[in-house]
Amino acid sequence: MNYRELFTGGLSAATVCACSLLVSGAVVASPMSHEVASEGGVMGGSFYVGAAYSPAFPSVTSFDMRESSKETSYVRGYDKSIATIDVSVPANFSKSGYTFAFSKNLITSFDGAVGYSLGGARVELEASYRRFATLADGQYAKSGAESLAAITRDANITETNYFVVKIDEITNTSVMLNGCYDVLHTDLPVSPYVCAGIGASFVDISKQVTTKLAYRGKVGISYQFTPEISLVAGGFYHGLFDESYKDIPAHNSVKFSGEAKASVKAHIADYGFNLGARFLFS
């Protein structure tokens, strides 16, 4: 088992635990929990806002691309040795069996949330943004050529049997409803937390936005810096329930006869860690 499998497996287990903890926290709501919240300075029944820097790593597998409504297509990548981009020349697409890969997002990956806390239980509405640029599978003579692919109806490419798709990135903007539980302590400012969420992701592939049902798990710790401010560090996993993306438009239809659109079947998820803060309003 590699580290990614261990990480995602742990978060899956945490998601199950979150559901149980939320139910027990909401139903029990014992006097002890209220006493803990009061003594620890985290008052129940308060609104909060949060923000986090969340470096993310893509988990994009089985990126199967083909012509829309066709069972079989062939995907060819641009020749690495060609120093110019000319998609009208079939011979420039010399790499058979080409598939796209995507890089990690360490810069433009952020989360923001607004929520309500009551004792150790919290519910929040969270928005996030992820951008994963296309990753070159080696050194290309022309920058950006790794974003181009020719989709053909036959194994051999000709002037009239292909169109060109350009995918230079995948972006995922999501809105999630999370249920969280904080394990509060009377004598420590540090509280472990676990969250489980469901919501919508808006996935942009080549300017075609597709809405998907999404899920998210989060685990971490919060440190009560002041009664109103908590510093947060943790990990997350974000996945989608469906793998189908249709009507990806052609970058250039060249001399292709027919509707130049592609479909993609891919498991698109991301995981990573977050560093941020929550601001409580009494």
Swiss-Prot record:
SUPFAM superfamilies: OMPA-like (SSF56925). This is Major surface antigen 4. Residues 1-29 form the signal peptide. Gene3D superfamilies: 2.40.160.20. InterPro entries: Msp4_OMP-like (IPR002566), OMP/PagP_b-brl (IPR011250). Transmembrane segments: none annotated. It comes from Anaplasma marginale. Belongs to the surface antigen msp4 family. It holds the Pfam family Surface_Ag_2. Keywords: Signal.
